């Protein structure tokens, strides 16, 4: 352990030693590890297969790690793990079809609070999720909220997508900002000056899973807006805070933002930032490694910062990824063993390390992992989880809040205001849509 730039740096060896002590080591594990240590023959018939559906990752190297691990597990157990990777926005549709048809992928890795919508087709995986959480320091509230529905674990938390603001340091300095703005009013001022110089801010408002929702939910919360009360039933979106955010955003759109953002998806702002078309964008750390490998000028000039504070504080909507085991799976025991196996710390760490701060593990054990301080420009991504909320806050995560997100109600509310609908009318529309869901 060393002290560097005022920060305690923990070596990987020190971290793993502490982690092993905390979890009791691998010797405490049963299941597949126990079988392999004992040299027992696999208990599954020849030709046994598991179908695993997941999104194409924005950090492709993580997919290779997982694919290699799936192949390793299959080889050891004499089974085949068939991994299918598709676009992230296509996963919910495929998952819904699997639940409806009672057939399809055995395991589905899915984002956000969608497990609540699909809970009827999911196996209770508490016997997998609970031991993992206990062994690894407990789950973050956000991770559990999006995977726990109706009093049971309908999915095993896998990761939380880190999200903050990517920006060009030199361009901000040119307009008088030597550090990223602390408040939304400062953000507006910065953006106005940047756009005047041909370097607008870029925000996505299309129907895409991550960035549009992250921005719109986060901005709403920063100004004190919420969808529902703590009871999870009473719709309270039509309040002063929401309206303030809804009035601010169209002004920022005209003054500060790239006006192509209405049709952007989660990859559009990445491309625009790397091309130098925009100066600032909210995103995961997926732009940074691409810049490092292919756009050295962008890489040297970019940095990351937390989201600005509003009157109510600083808050984030962070996408989560969870693993659902479907009821139609004929090999549920094997599927659970596979999930336990690749979520064990010695294998999960390899995936997490490869993700390079893109993903926050769902459990608290990893907070002091050295990956977070490997590059000072990425440290901000570790702490965004502290200010994260789930859709439907202050109520509990639920099927209703999942439906609201799936229908992009908040995103469309902001998009309507951008396109000229008076903010008051856009807010009334969104409130009415929420009331239909929560009725």
Language model features by range: what are they?
Residues 1-14:
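N-terminal secretory signal peptides
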Residues 32, 149-158, 163, 188-235, ...:
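Extracytoplasmic/periplasmic solute-binding protein
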Residues 43-45, 126-139, 207, 225-244, ...:
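Short, solvent-exposed loop/beta-turn-alpha elements that line the ligand-binding surface or hinge
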Residues 44, 80-81, 120, 173, ...:
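Conserved C-terminal helix/tail region of periplasmic/extracytoplasmic solute-binding proteins
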Residues 190-193, 232-262, 307:
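Glycine-centered hinge/linker elements that transmit conformational signals in sensory
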């Amino acid at each position: 352990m060393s002290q560097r730039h005022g920060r305690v740096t923990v070596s990987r060896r020190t971290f793993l030693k502490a982690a092993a002590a905390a979890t009791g080591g691998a010797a405490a594990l049963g299941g597949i590890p126990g079988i392999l240590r004992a040299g027992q023959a696999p208990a599954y018939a020849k030709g046994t297969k598991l179908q695993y559906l997941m999104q194409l990752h924005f950090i492709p190297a993580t997919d290779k790690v997982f694919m290699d691990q799936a192949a390793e597990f299959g080889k050891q157990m004499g089974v085949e793990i068939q991994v299918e990777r598709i676009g992230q926005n296509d996963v919910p549709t495929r998952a819904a079809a699997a639940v409806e048809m009672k057939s399809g992928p055995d395991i589905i890795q899915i984002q956000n609070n969608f497990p609540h919508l699909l809970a009827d087709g999911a196996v209770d995986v508490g016997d997998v999720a609970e031991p993992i959480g206990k062994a690894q320091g407990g789950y973050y509230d956000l991770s559990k909220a999006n995977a726990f529905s109706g009093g049971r674990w309908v999915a095993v938390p896998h990761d939380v997508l880190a999200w903050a603001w990517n920006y060009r340091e030199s361009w901000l300095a040119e307009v008088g900002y030597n550090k990223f703005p602390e408040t939304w009013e400062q953000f507006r001022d910065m953006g106005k000056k940047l756009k005047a110089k041909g370097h607008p801010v870029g925000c996505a408002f299309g129907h895409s899973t991550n960035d549009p929702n992250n921005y719109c939910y986060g901005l709403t919360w920063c100004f004190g807006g919420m969808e529902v009360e703590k009871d999870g039933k009473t719709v309270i979106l039509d309040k002063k805070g929401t309206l303030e955010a809804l009035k601010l955003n169209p002004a920022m759109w005209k003054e500060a933002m790239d006006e192509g953002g209405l049709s952007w998806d989660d990859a559009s702002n990445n491309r625009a930032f790397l091309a130098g078309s925009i100066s600032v964008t909210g995103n995961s750390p997926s732009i940074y490694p691409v810049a490092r490998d292919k756009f050295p000028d962008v890489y040297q000039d970019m940095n990351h910062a937390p989201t600005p504070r509003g009157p109510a504080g600083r808050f984030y909507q962070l996408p989560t990824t969870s693993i659902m085991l479907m009821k139609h799976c004929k090999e549920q025991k094997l599927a659970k063993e596979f999930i336990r196996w690749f979520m064990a710390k010695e294998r999960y760490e390899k995936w997490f390390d490869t993700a390079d701060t893109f993903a926050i593990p769902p459990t608290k054990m990893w907070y002091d992992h050295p990956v977070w301080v490997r590059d000072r420009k990425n440290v901000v991504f570790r702490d965004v989880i502290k200010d994260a909320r789930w859709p439907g806050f202050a109520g509990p995560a639920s099927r209703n809040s999942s439906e609201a997100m799936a229908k992009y109600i908040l995103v469309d509310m902001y998009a309507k205001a951008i396109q000229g609908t008076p903010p008051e009318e856009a807010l009334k529309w969104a409130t009415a849509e929420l009331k239909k869901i929560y009725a």
